[in-house]
Amino acid sequence: MSGRDLELTLDRVSSIEYPALVKEAFLNNWHASAHRSEVTSNCASLNDRYCWVLSRNQIFIWERAKSSHRAIIPTQLPLPTSGLPRSVKCVVVYDGVHRGANKTPCPGILVVSPEGVLRHWTSIESQTYIEEVLDINNEVALRVELTDEPIDGKSASFLLTTTSGTVYFLNGKGQDSAKTGALECNKVAGREAHGFRRRLSSIMFGGESKESTSLITNSFQHQSKDLLVVTVSPDVLTVYNMYTPCELWSLKTKEFFQPKIASFFEADLKRTPLKVRARLIDAAVFRDGLMILIGGTHEESQSVHMFMVWMSANWQTEQPTGVVWSARVPMNEHRALFSKIDDSIYSNLTLCIPKNTAESKKADRTDGIIIINPYFAVSLYLPFDLAKPKKPESLYRHVSIPPRDQLLGYAICSQYVYIMMLESGVSTIRLLPRGFADSSIYTHEQVVVPSLSVGTDDWPILSELLSEMVASGLPKTPLYQSLHRAFELFAEKHMAESEEELKAIIKMPDQEIARIVSQFLYAIIDYSDAANKTDTELHAKRVLTSRIMLFLKHMGVYERIISSPLGISRGGILSLRVGGTMLGEVSERVAASTAIWTWKTSNETNSAVFDAIIEKVLRIPEVQDLGLKDKDALFGRCGLVHHIPVVAAQQLEKNVIGKTKSHRFEVFHAVCELLSGIKETIISWRNCRTKVAIPKFPIWWTLETFASCYRDVAEKIIEELKNGSSTDSERARLLMYILSIYDFYLSESDSQPDNDKVLQEMIALGKPADAMELAEKHKDFGTLVKNYLTTDVGTRQKTFERYKKMFEKDDFEMYLCDYLKEHGRNDVLLQQGGSRVDAYLDNFKELRYSREIANKQFGKAALTLMSLADAETKSFSKFVEFLTRAYYCACSSIDGTDVSEVLDFYKRRYPEMKHRKRIPTEILKICFGNDLDAMMSVEDMLEWNMAVQPNDEASVEGFARAFHLLADLLAVHPDSDELKKKIDKTWKALVDYDEWNRVRSKEDVEKKTIFGKFCNYLINSYPADKGDSFPIWMPISRRLIFPTDIDTVLDECIANTTGNHLSWIKGHLKWIGEQLCKQALLPKSAFFRPDMKQVGSISQAALEAFGPILQRREQRFIDQLNRDSMMET
């Protein structure tokens, strides 16, 4: 049979069917998103034994072989949470070491989320897994592949590739990793990252930079002599050798492939094409070579053109030097998908070559090279030797995916390429004889399940059920019959007849209408018949209650009853409420009952806990009066559903839950899942766009019935977490339950929380962000203020200002003032602005200076602050604040107040403040321990600066700080004899610091003594503060520290100095004094030294260029001074 007689078909695999749970998951994904499916085109796959489907946060896996005597029950496994789209490329299903009931290996599953969270099941029968957070350097996981099967007690090993091109090796961790599934992650190879700074520098200064590479779109491993990993990105094709490990070779698209693509365009245009651009799409091994799919564009075409190139088997050992074979892939169908302006075509094409096809030297009995797109599939049939193409004509075939169907995923197996579709199931892509495939299977319609539908076709069934509800729960009076008929006519879209039927009721008072509607609705939600399925009955109640709300709204009844007084029974006690409370309660009771039923049927543990709960609920007097015996019959009584969460919370009491840890956590999880499910269902029902919006009244039914049990459960979870008996995974899970459960309690509560205890406990347990989110949502101002007081000033003040606007109606501003004053945070209180804060602060005398500043009475504020600074003897930070503010206020005073005393005080105390700040933290810790804010006197600062230091450099800097302090003080008090004595005492300490008996020469004095090094510091070292370009200590000030009588100082020294030592010291000081005199004559500009670290790259370059100029300028001044001194002599 010639190739022309072949056609590409989708051959249905009847032996593979989707289980009911998987179909339900598909339906849930559809209905959950308002007529938009959440099912992606990369969520399903299969292998020779199993199929699997990703659905939201779970994965379904089942055997391919269909059983004739029992239904297919898939295994459901939870997936790690992810904020990025999932892909089956990151799922590996393999044969594990465990044996099932039929003695066949149970599959193991490895799942990695895009963020790098790994879950590993060594056997799906155990339902236990290992979870690891892989260190993949904040990259996104792209693909995971199995490298080695589990053997000899070692776990299976895998290769993980990220979108950045990094390859990680996942291998077993521990001696028994085959059973535990523990894995460890090690980086094997990857592309070199090119930082932003290098590229920016290259742009600004013209340096050469490597061509940036784009994200990896696909990768795969190939086992030959070595284990190779091929990564494909639009710009680069890279091959890594895992055994080395290293990069084997890399080919850039622009340099290697683009010229070949340009030759095709040149042949078509008969001239050189312009703006040719090629992008790699995918690659696969074919006949030992490498087949590559490439997309190309040029200026004169608005479409993306497809090409295939093949490189010989040499690619496995060395970098290819050229393309062996290449061809254009015609894409004549679906041309709109290949528009040049839409780049999605590059990511939606996948190259699929089954193993047998890839290894076959001939194309006979193969299906060719398959290219898959969500809308079509293409086969390229190559019946010739690619290395020696005698007949280079290839066969191209195309098949479309059914228009009403959706691609779920694909699988490349040994023989075929499988595709999994939403409606049509599983098919293979086959090149079959023309007419062989029967396409009639694609024309069938989905069967509508009446119990689960909400359309017009289900109304006859719902109408029949409604009649049973009304007949069993209401008296046969004309009013109820009229309401029933009116609603029936409304549901059948006979609006005029419905309004006519309702006239008698419309004439009644609003309160009476509310009573009739209430009884009608309660007759619906409290109906129960053992002959009906519970889920079908609950769904019918939900549909009917929703439609009744629309009915009431459309007929003008809703507005009349929503505010009407209405008596509602609560445990046999009649409470006066309004019609709106009743309408919301009815709908939410049905939603809560549905949530409880879903929870009960989800797993066996929940069912067992439910039985224990129901046994206690049935003993409640209100329930006993109904004579219910069947446990499931309680679901038909939605009016009693509030007892279930209350009794469920009681199951967590210590005398009930039991002492076994495993059983205790099972009950904890079951109860928390129940409460979370009720909460989520009620909240989602309130937010449903299709229902009539009912305002929530202050006293809601949930608060009166069961909301308090949510707080009880949250407190029990916190108590359990404090015990410390839970594992990390259990702890994380319980914390997530608290967020959901306590959020519902706060939303239902009628009082505003303040510094809520549970929220504070959540912060202490490591969930500050979530706790703050709840506090902000529910207006717990105490928790908000307490938490943000621990943040930096900028963040704190911006947040407070935002809260003032957000909670303006709740008077957050005054709450903040009261809180700050009560907790002694006057510093933060003074940062607040506004007229209301000003009025508040006027009531407190201790904050007088702040008011004086606010009122621009700067002179008075300066005197107040000066007295505070003078009285401060404990806190240095407060002293600095008071002193600085006093000076600024004095400088800003324009009210005529005499502030000379303040300025003189600042002048006298400023040196103390300045030099106290320069003392290193290490010295302060030695002095005061952790109290780094302690005040220090001048004597203390001198003593600790001159203390023994760990090295000579630190000692010199310490003496420099001491002398600098004395110099600044002497500049303020030039006639102070006491300061001069302290200078002499400091010189004496400097000389006594060294062991002079080891000094043998004058050079030793300069190089080996602290005295000599300090003298050298005086003339050669001019450090500046960070960000300043001038020294902190100028030569003219350094001259002030010279002793008045050096002979007296040396005579009082206790150091073991000889006559030579004394002469060397005197000579050295004389020479230093001369040098400082010369330097003092230099202008200030001669000491200009810019801080290179505080300027940008361009400024730095400019300043570095001016550096030699400044140095020559300084040297010119020095030479001039030397010449002048020589002339004088």
UniProtKB/Swiss-Prot annotation:
Keyword Nucleotide-binding included in the entry's annotation: no
GO cellular component terms, semicolon-separated: kinetochore; nuclear membrane; nuclear pore; nuclear pore outer ring
Signal peptide: none
Protein transport recorded as keyword: yes
Coiled coil: none
InterPro entries: Nucleoporin_Nup133/Nup155_N, Nup133-like, WD40/YVTN_repeat-like_dom_sf
UniProt cross-references to Pfam families, sorted A to Z: Nucleoporin_N
Family of the protein in this entry: Belongs to the nucleoporin Nup133 family.
Annotated source species: Caenorhabditis elegans
Protein name: Nuclear pore complex protein 15
Gene: npp-15
UniProt record, GO biological process: poly(A)+ mRNA export from nucleus; protein import into nucleus; transcription-dependent tethering of RNA polymerase II gene DNA at nuclear periphery
Keywords for this protein: Developmental protein, mRNA transport, Nuclear pore complex, Nucleus, Protein transport, Translocation, Transport
